[in-house]
Amino acid sequence: MSKQIVVHNINELDKYKNTILNNLNNSANMLQQVLNNNGALDAFKIFKFEKIATEPLSGNLENLIEVINQAHTYLISIMAVEYLNKLYPTQAFIIDWRNIPGYDIEPVGGTIIAECFSATSYKSNGKLVADLKRFACNTEVENKYEFFYDKDFTENHKEYYREKYPDIEIVKFKDIK
């Protein structure tokens, strides 16, 4: 499955979400087998170092940590396009899941950019601040969005960043669906 897609209709996202969820189910079954057939130390070594999970889009075997990170980023991106579609219902969007420079979500011929991530903390790897600074430097685009999920970002944090970066809409999802 391509890691760059153009979404013309919000219903097109269902195919990708279903693929991701099916591959996560496959991964859960593989993980259960590892747990059933190994002691704790061996199981955790396998989880960390071997390709024992299913990559969420391609279905190829991949490292568990990569699968966890990719699945959540893909799902956040889908949720972001669903969010943007409510604001811009006639706009087609490009979702870029490749690991290359650029933005995660851009319109087909429009003035919107978005970045997406999930992390154990919004401070992890400085991702939020790096994205916001990069957005602030982009004076050509008028609609900028940061979409993410974590467990410790509060309304106080949002206000702090909103004051610092007033031209960027920060959207912290409450759950990943």
Set out the residue ranges of the language-model regions.
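Short glycine/proline-enriched coil/turn segments at helix->beta-strand junctions
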Residues: 89, 108-111, 139-143
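Conserved catalytic cores of phosphodiester-cleaving nucleases, focusing on short active-site segments
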Residues: 105-122
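Catalytic cores of nucleic-acid endonucleases
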Residues: 118-170
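Nuclease-adjacent, charged terminal/linker segments that flank catalytic cores
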Residues: 1-51
